[in-house]
A protein has these predicted regions:
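Polybasic low-complexity intrinsically disordered regions
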Residues: 2-170, 175-178
Length: 180
């Protein structure tokens, strides 16, 4: 049905994932995007805070995922000589130029795509829903999991930010969210 959400492919439930991530201490230095986040934080986020556009001591967040299409097919090439020997359907290993990408469902366009899921937490009480914390995940990441990964990383990397309320859509409709 057009506009419907894809079923989660994760093997772990929200109920299992939430306490695991809540008790994980993420270190920005260990993240592949660490230097990019530091640049974002210093040049954009802190500027928004200093101008009074975002209030980190009483933050209302909205969160949602959006597709980031990187190609129309998997980017891979053979590392074997099978094609030279006339074997076209070998099962040999391949080299993937974007190994952290995969296939996901875009419910707003009603199609599959190859790439990432950008989960964005924004300041819903700011004039323009200014971004607070973005996180790229493989395209197959369901929003219910994308939020948890993004939220708990945000808490680790921005410890002085106090979240007062969170606005999420129906993809996040799981009892552990309400209980948290």
């Amino acid at each position: 049905i057009k506009g419907s959400k894809a079923a989660p492919v994760e093997k772990v439930s929200v109920e299992q994932l939430l306490p695991k991530l809540e008790n994980t201490a993420f270190r920005i230095e260990e993240q592949p995007y660490g230097s990019l986040f530091q640049l974002y934080k210093n040049e954009f986020l802190y500027q928004s805070v200093s101008k009074g556009l975002i209030t980190p001591e009483n933050l209302a967040l909205a969160g949602d995922g959006t597709p980031v299409i990187t190609s129309h097919r998997e980017r891979k090439h053979r590392i074997c000589d099978c094609a030279l020997n006339g074997i076209t359907d070998c099962k040999c290993d391949r080299y993937f130029s974007q190994p952290d990408c995969d296939i996901g469902w875009d419910s707003s366009r009603d199609c599959w795509y190859h790439g990432y899921d950008l989960y964005m937490l924004v300041a819903s009480d700011s004039e323009s829903d200014l971004p607070v914390f973005p996180l790229l995940s493989p395209a197959s990441t369901h929003d219910s999991h994308g939020f948890l990964h993004t939220f708990f990383r945000m808490r680790s990397f921005l410890p002085d930010y106090t979240v007062s309320k969170v606005l999420l859509d129906s993809a996040h409709d799981a009892m552990p969210y309400y209980q948290y």
